[in-house]
């Protein structure tokens, strides 16, 4: 059995996910009265988004995380705001994920919103210095795990014809970056997979929505030591608010900051050598990982 933390009512009343429309008549996802599952939810922006979801009126927030102490501390804080529960889950272990989802359904009910936020980075290494263990773990947690978790939630969401899956990728999944090649590869995979699922659901007129988020470096400790010449390191509170707003608006793809969308355009129009010169040398993107330390 997967360990869990937090008291929870024995009797559950299912509350259907509420929908409303914005000023343009577009259907929005309501966090209020929704059950929100967040992987990597006991630290960083995962924890912040969990708190914000409760503040927005989520009927419950469920967090999956590998760190048992962080889970306990997070749930203690969350329970001051609303209903929360935590499970110790190794998202790189498929059997653990499957068992955790079944336990989550039994004890918490249906998941309305899934936020794939768990991730790791091993940086400041050129590719030939990466170990097989580094590669396997990074790809497993960053790329495979979001698919495996979504594979548990999505059939139930489709059956109910409502739900939302948000996957946190990275700006490194749009623009190549030296000394983080494996991390970049994992995030390119997330973007390609997540947006493809969005199209699959859209083509069948499903009310299940998919949002892919590609943020720049966020100041959470995960990227300690990163230096950015042109773009500021993102504030975790503001970034978390933008992600939740993207979910509410059913935004298909959200780059943070917005200027990264311009780089995507330039990447498609400019010769590779020109793009490398502008982004790598002038803007300094290719040297951001030179002094990377990461979370201790």
Where are the regions a protein language model picked out?
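The beta1-alpha1 cofactor-binding region of Rossmann-like NAD(H)/NADP(H)-dependent oxidoreductases
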Residues: 68-69, 88-99, 132
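C-terminal helical subdomain
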Residues: 212, 228-264
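Canonical Rossmann dinucleotide-binding motif of NAD(H)/NADP(H)-dependent dehydrogenases/reductases
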Residues: 29-61
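Residue(s) in the substrate-gating loop at a strand-loop-helix junction
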Residues: 170
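Conserved glycine-rich Rossmann-like NAD(P)H-binding loop of the short-chain dehydrogenase/reductase
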Residues: 58-74
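Substrate-binding pocket helix/loop in short-chain dehydrogenase/reductase
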Residues: 125-127, 131-137
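Active-site helix of classical SDR
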Residues: 150, 186
């Amino acid at each position: 059995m997967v360990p869990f933390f937090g008291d929870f009512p024995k009797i559950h009343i299912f509350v259907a996910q509420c929908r409303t429309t914005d000023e343009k008549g577009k259907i929005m996802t309501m966090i209020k009265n929704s059950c929100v599952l967040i992987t990597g939810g006991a630290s960083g922006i995962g924890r912040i988004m969990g708190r914000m979801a409760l503040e927005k009126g989520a009927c419950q927030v469920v967090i999956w995380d590998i760190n048992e102490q962080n889970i306990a501390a997070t749930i203690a804080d969350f329970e001051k705001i609303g209903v929360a529960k935590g499970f110790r889950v190794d998202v790189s272990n498929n059997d653990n994920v499957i068992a955790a989802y079944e336990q989550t359904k039994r004890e918490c009910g249906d998941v309305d919103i899934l936020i794939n936020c768990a991730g790791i980075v091993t940086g400041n290494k050129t590719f030939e210095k990466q170990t097989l263990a580094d590669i396997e773990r990074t790809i497993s947690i960053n790329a495979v795990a979001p698919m495996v978790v979504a594979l548990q939630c999505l059939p139930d969401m489709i059956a109910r014809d409502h739900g939302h899956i948000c996957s946190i990728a990275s700006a490194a999944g749009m623009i190549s970056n030296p000394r983080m090649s494996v991390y970049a590869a994992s995030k390119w995979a997330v973007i390609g997979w997540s947006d493809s699922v969005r199209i699959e659901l859209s083509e069948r007129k499903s009310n299940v929505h998919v949002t892919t988020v590609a943020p720049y470096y966020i100041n959470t400790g995960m990227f300690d030591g990163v230096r950015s010449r042109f773009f500021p390191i993102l504030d975790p509170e503001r970034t978390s608010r933008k992600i939740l707003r993207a979910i509410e608006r059913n935004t298909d793809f959200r780059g943070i900051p917005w200027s990264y969308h311009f780089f995507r355009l330039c990447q498609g129009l400019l010769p590779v050598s020109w793009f490398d010169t502008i982004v790598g040398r002038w803007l300094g993107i290719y040297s951001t990982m030179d002094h990377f330390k990461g979370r201790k």
